[in-house]
Amino acid sequence: MNQYQRQETMNKVNRALQRARDTKSLIIGRGVVSRSAEMFLELFAGCKAVIVADENTWQVAGADVKESLDSSGIVSEQPYVFPARDFYAHWQHIESLKSYLESKDAIAIAVGSGVINDTVKLVSHMLGRRYMCVGTAASMDGFTAYGASITKDGNKQTFDCPAPLGFIMDSEIAAAAPKELAASGYADLIAKIPAGADWMLADAVGSEKIDSFAWELVQDGLKDALSIRLRFLPVTYP
């Protein structure tokens, strides 16, 4: 991506933030995990913080977020760190995190990817709070999406809850994540093709009118994004 393309992308992002209902601040770039305190002060001045991560995401970014908070004088509670083994978006983790956070007068900072983000998203909503997220992998496209996908009673369900008020993605951390996570994110990009077709059909039958701004934001750069060869993935043929 050249300088012009980067500027065009950021212009689109800024316009999207102006229209967004939930997310109001976004920082993406190299080394920006160090700006976690900056965003927290912008969005939650005067509040305490509490980092929520798993064992892996704590190592790759959680400790850096904590250092950023400490160096800025932000008071933070003891971080809540899930075990990495067999950790997924299950209701039992919702209950355990809720039990911990409801006794803390603090704003959660989700440090991780889809599972951590959705878990903190729903629990924060249940407690009537907002939160921010620091991403650790480009494994999906729902960091700033409304709703959380959680397994409850044996079924994956989507629960209504607002997106994070702020989101940070450090590109160096994302690039260093396991390659299968990037492949998962690439699959989410591919899903934009049938999603676009669904929206066209919904518009045609009068169910959901296409919003031209949202359409262009998602679809205009999709072909270029999908044309990037995933050189780090082995290709095998039968």
Predicted regions and their residues:
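Short glycine-/acidic-enriched loop or helix-start segments at secondary-structure transitions
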Residues: 61-63, 119-121, 143, 178-179
